Amino acid sequence: MIIEKEKMEEIMSLVIEEANIAIKEGNSPFAAFLLDKEGNILYRAHNTSNTNTDPTAHAEINLIRMACKELKTKDLSNYILISNAWSCSMCFSAAIKAKINRFIFGAESESNMNPNVTIFDIKDKCKNEINVISGILRDECKIQIEEARS
């Protein structure tokens, strides 16, 4: 099933709210949700790297760990990941390892990522088909990230 743009924007506004929780807790301004194919929100997570003193506690990693544990599976191929920014190489690779193949993103990745490997660099090397929709509430997501970083 295809999720309408209006529904994606509605969900992205909730992702932005979740990212605000990360910011208030002193973490990086990122959040991610796991959706079913109809666009229903099943799981929510935000970055907790600083509060957990864990450099791998990005929103997507937290989300994947939570969903796999609760669903008792490592196969998330029936779900969609939505995030306020392009995933870093670690998170995008982890999502692909969890067999997620549908992604919805807001803003592009930050240019200072290390390593600076984009989702499209990784997507181009995947053996399976990966579907990416980007730019949903892009400006709102970008402003949130820039303001949190300043």
Positions of the model-derived regions?
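A short, polar/charged loop-to-alpha-helix boundary motif
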Residues: 51-61
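Short beta->alpha transition motifs characteristic of CBS
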Residues: 42-50
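Small-residue (primarily alanine) positions within well-ordered alpha-helices
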Residues: 15, 19-22, 32, 59, ...
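Short beta-strand scaffold segments in enzyme catalytic cores
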Residues: 30-39
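Short loop/turn motifs at secondary-structure junctions
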Residues: 28, 75-77, 99
